[in-house]
Amino acid sequence: PIKRFDLVHEVNSRGSFALCQAALPHLMKSDAGRILVLAPPIALDPKWLNGTLAYTISKYSMSMLVLGLSGELAMDGIAVNAIWPATTIDTAAVRYNEALGGEEMVRRSRKPRIVADAALHILSQNKTVTGQFYTDESALMEAGVEDFEKYAVEPGMPLQQDFYL
């Protein structure tokens, strides 16, 4: 329905764009201008459009924002990159949505800390690193992390790959 489409685009697409625009004057004055967007790498697999069309389009528009702004802002010394979880993350969306698997899915997820640690690595890179799409896992491997078990909600449990990978 159009109401759902409008809502997810208002939050995801427009919200991300508006936040970036509002931050630009401050980022332009900074020697450490960085934008990190929670956006998936673009994988044009029809399975992501089946039943989640409005949400998927809104998330992919955020991915396009990363590509566009990284090109536009590179000469201003502002890096724009994206991060996306490699596995499901224990969030309220996963925990309380039975359609996503509820408690069983939580057990097969990682803690939110993995995304925070990966974001720290991405944001600490040279500002010439821009227009990149990282998974939390790939960013941490790049940072030298080898033990990912500490991020598991239930260590030893097989992990659920994220839905957009």
Predicted region positions:
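Catalytic loop of short-chain dehydrogenase/reductase
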Residues: 2, 28-29, 34-75, 86-88
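Acidic donor-binding helix in nucleotide-sugar-dependent glycosyltransferases
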Residues: 7, 72, 114
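Short-chain dehydrogenase/reductase
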Residues: 9, 13, 51-63, 108-113
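A short, exposed helix-loop element centered on a Lys and neighboring polar residues
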Residues: 20-21, 67
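C-terminal helical subdomain
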Residues: 82, 102-165
